[in-house]
């Protein structure tokens, strides 16, 4: 919300539905599958209310990134969403700028969900940070529709398809394939999950540890039972980042996890080649950083 606020007068309004956020929104009497179906029903009801002829697409991150701290979809959620979109002629657009290109253990995070979107946004892992590059992958039917029409695509940029950036991206993808790094991400992810649970799973101010592959989020709470967040004025996430840096660990902090104002979390996204020793250090140093930050609150 805070990123959008200053540009709001220039932007087209979009309708939002509830995110897949089981830690806070799944009812105690509800199974994960039932929760996912409820969200899909909400999406369908919203499309019907607006009129399917007025809805061009449903856009979501396959795994929520910076805004909410690696929200992992419940089983069947995206399959149900895909079915809703197909019934109403609505495109499914998935944003995998953060979670895609191997970060969660498959090249595309949506592979785990067994869903194919109509459009897929990718970036960070595409070039591994060596060159700035992003891409939009489109299903053939969309490309064919444009080709059979005017054939004119007026959304290019000056450095679109830059040869050096594309060469870097190709080199990164070749290394990922050559060195079997997707399998390594899956293996390391299981190890990191176990280490984080051992280090922070019973921490009185850690609400949830969630993620997949080498993409993890830790949500902080004032009270585990009520899930009450900390006062946003404390900026706990920023304190944790500062403490983590002093301990030699880089994390991605963010506030507003719950509703755009309340809530704190930190993201972990270590390199695909992180060793087991380094994974253990990450879990240990994050625990130390959280404890040090809380001591100053």
Protein language model regions, located:
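Conserved N-terminal phosphate-binding loop of PLP-dependent enzymes in the Aspartate aminotransferase
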Residues: 1-297
